[in-house]
Amino acid sequence: MPIHTPRRTSLFQRSKTLPTNSYRRFTSPVIPTFRYDDGDTVSYDGDDSSNLPTVPNPEEKPVPVPSQSPSQRITRLWTQFSLTHCLKFICSCSFTYVMFLRSKVSRLEAENIILLTRCNSSSDNNEMEETNSRAVVFFSVIITFVLPFLLYMYLDDLSHVKNLLRRTNQKKEDVPLKKRLAYSLDVCFSVYPYAKLLALLLATVVLIVYGGLALYAVSDCGVDEALWLSWTFVADSGSHADRVGVGARIVSVAISAGGMLIFATMLGLISDAISKMVDSLRKGKSEVLESNHILILGWSDKLGSLLKQLAIANKSIGGGVVVVLAERDKEEMETDIAKFEFDLMGTSVICRSGSPLILADLKKVSVSNARAIIVLGSDENADQSDARALRVVLSLTGVKEGWKGHVVVEMCDLDNEPLVKLVGGERIETVVAHDVIGRLMIQCALQPGLAQIWEDILGFENAEFYIKKWPQLDGYCFEDVLISFPNAIPCGVKVAADGKIVLNPSDDYVLKEGDEILVIAEDDDTYAPGSLPEVRMCHFPKMQDPPKYPEKILFCGWRRDIDDMIKVLEALLAPGSELWMFNEVPDQEREKKLTDAGLNISKLVNIKLVHRQGNAVIRRHLESLPLETFDSILILAEQSLENSIVHSDSRSLATLLLIRDIQSKRLPYKDAKSSALRISGFPNCCWIRKMQQASDKSIVISEILDSRTKNLVSVSRISDYVLSNELVSMALAMVAEDKQINRVLKELFAEKGNELCIRPAEFYIYDQEEVCFYDIMRRARQRQEIIIGYRLAGMEQAVINPTDKSKLTKWSLDDVFVVIASSQ
């Protein structure tokens, strides 16, 4: 760099350039000259000609000068003298200061020249040092970036690391370090959910730092500026377009490429997280934040009819919430529920995938806030299903928060019911599916038409049982309470003293404070007590119940609880009855199974067991039976096929078709003796008589497990009555809505106590008599019965809980009434 040396001039040389007068003005002191004239005029001037004394012009006229006193002239002279010397002093000082400043400027200029020389030499050294530092940074970045890849490539060849690994863990298998490192990373990413995000953040920081240092090494910007540019290249891949220089452009492109890779990875992680969240929602892994809902644990073929009944029950409140927890995929459950051909009527069904045996899954569906919990039986055999139900009840008891609702457990074997109640306590209500179906089949076999009555009462479409307290009826006797509800029919009383439910109490029972009334009504908000109507107590026929005649019943198949069905028949049938048992179980094994189940065959008084061995789907085996002589034929679901509903229903359907075909060919040879004895208590045109004479054949009752198959059989009219698991679903739904109803159902299903019966009209009225329904209810009380409905001769279905009970109606002897009566 050229050095510019300023030209130095001395003060003396510069003074030569000044004008002569100026030089003299600075070098010669100005001495004032005083001259006194006649006219007391003083003129003085040092160098200025204007201040010299003027020569008077003889031609000019003298100007008169005013006269002054001597003291004034002396004062004026001293003032002028003082001012003159002050000015001279100031000028001398100024000149001296100027000379001092000029000498100081000269010294500063010399020092400036020296400093410039030194700075030029140091800048050359700094440029060299900066160049060296950028080179060091560049090579450091390359080495530290390449070194990890080289170490990873030759990681397995590091013998000392292998030896160290063998010494520290000699028992483990010698695994390559690459695999071990990959395994450690995999475990870290799997165990710690935020490890991927932290790794991405670390990679971003490393890229920014390495890219910034590399950019600093190949450009002339500072470190802080390079780091900022590196971040902008990572965040925006197009911001490197204005880079100048080959090195800067290469580094910028590399940083931008790394930034695109990082952002692509980040988008992948975000997309993966969102996919997992959506997948969790789709698979039903999220938590259910509901309260006062009904929780269903498990999945079975009864779920469809169960949801239908719950939806109908919740219709009056605008719909409720039903949560289903099962070990199935959530999408599959929702797809199967969508296939059900019924309207949910505002009820929301929420499906969650999980196991009822896991407490975490139970908490996920808000088990503590559910108002009712239904435990469905599995599709396994009865013992496995009951064992699983027992484990579910144990899991429910392990919930620390507890549960405010009651639990309804579907059992398959009646013998396992006490064990579940022992584990769960008083809040457990059990519904034994096999027992319910078996008892209903027997009741329908002995009283044709009762199946439709039970479907109306158990289902929520028509009338069902409700229990409620009515303080305004305290002090009333049950005889008056019976006719106090225009839109309901009282059936019993829940005694406040001991909590027992008394069905069909005596007329003189007086309601006490706290007692609740059991009624049959359309809904819980559709009835209320009113004023007592006027009832006419006129004369009516008093007929005795017809005597029982021996029955001949055939069981096709072997059920699990067939011993309980035999006990019920023993209690209900007249002496001399026969029970034919046709199945594939050997005779000796049958007796052993019945004895092991607790049945003492030798103590059977009313029925006689007749054993026949054969296959119910083989025609020649069925032809060996006197099918035309049986009063009722019950086709039971085979115990050996209880794991497969489809196979069981197919077998029952094949047996039904074969029996009907054989009966049709033997029709001319049918002995009508037993049928004549059986229907002697009813008029010739009675509805019950027509049912008992269905197609002039024996009454055939089929047990069909799948409700869809049941609908097909009902439409084809090849069977008189079809009972399926739909009735069990109705019972589960009713007990879930009110657990007290379970005690009512158990008494009505039992062989002792009160039961549903169908009575002919001649028990209560004369032919063509015109009376209201209240009058008939009062007449039935003379027989200790409660009439809950009727079926007119021209109607297809019975009417339960008629609306206008005070309306006069003309009755016929062909009509029948549905009553609750004490079993004989």
UniProtKB/Swiss-Prot annotation:
Region (Disordered): 45-70
One annotated GO biological process: monoatomic ion transmembrane transport
Origin: domain of life: Eukaryota
Gene Ontology cellular component list: nuclear membrane
Transmembrane segments: 81-101, 135-155, 198-218, 250-270
InterPro entries: CASTOR/POLLUX/SYM8-like, CASTOR/POLLUX/SYM8_dom, NAD(P)-bd_dom_sf, RCK_N
Residues in RCK N-terminal domain copies: 291-432, 550-699
Subcellular compartments: Nucleus membrane
Bilayer topology annotation: Multi-pass membrane protein
One Pfam assignment: Castor_Poll_mid
Major subcellular site: nucleus
Biased composition (Low complexity): 45-54
Keyword Protein biosynthesis part of the UniProt annotation: no
UniProt entry keywords in alphabetical sequence: Coiled coil, Ion channel, Ion transport, Membrane, Nucleus, Transmembrane, Transmembrane helix, Transport
Coiled coil: 325-346
Further comment found in the protein's record: The absence of an ortholog of CASTOR may explain the inability of Arabidopsis to form root symbioses with mycorrhizal fungi.
Family: Belongs to the castor/pollux (TC 1.A.1.23) family.
Protein name, UniProt field: Probable ion channel POLLUX
UniProt lineage: Eukaryota, Viridiplantae, Streptophyta, Embryophyta, Tracheophyta
